[in-house]
Amino acid sequence: MRDWVYGFFMAWGMFLAIPCPKKLWSETARRKMLVCLPLVGLLVGGIWAGAWLLVRGAPGPVRAAVCAAVPWLVTGFMHLDGYMDVCDAVLARRDLPTRRRILKDSHCGAFAVICLVLLALGQWSLFLSAESIVWQALLLI
């Protein structure tokens, strides 16, 4: 049982920006951590749903902005950095070694910024239009 608790807190500490109540690492619980990842996803989804409930009475654009931002904030923008790196490299239209160099570069290029803006606008508009189809939108989450 202890390995399951350790595994959950290890997954939490690794994939969420929310401070973990217990900073644990156990090699024996490492496999349990992988099994606990869906629980961490449910935690993110629960926070997301809670944020949506908190802003129910707010104007539509505010609700949409909060719903688009919450998963990024909760996960510490984890996957967003990789998304931007890939957009920078793929859209550069260069040879393979140059693309690899772009992937390793810590600076943010124009393609990354453009793709981030398009992603944010797409999510915002999805949540803005989802107010009339709330239950269908919740099924997507």
Positions of the model-derived regions?
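Multi-pass membrane catalytic core of lipid/isoprenoid biosynthesis enzymes
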Residues: R30-W48, A89-L140
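Membrane-embedded alpha-helical segments that form the functional core of polytopic membrane enzymes
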Residues: V35-C87, W135-L140
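A short, glycine- and basic residue-enriched loop/turn
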Residues: E27-T28, D81
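Short alpha-helical scaffolding segments that buttress acidic/His motifs in well-ordered protein cores
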Residues: A11-F15, A69, L103, I114
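Membrane-proximal soluble regions of multi-pass membrane proteins
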Residues: M1-W25
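C-terminal ends of transmembrane helices
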Residues: P19-L24, M78, P97-T98
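Short helix-capping/hinge motifs at transmembrane helix termini and TM-loop junctions
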Residues: A17-P21, R56, E131
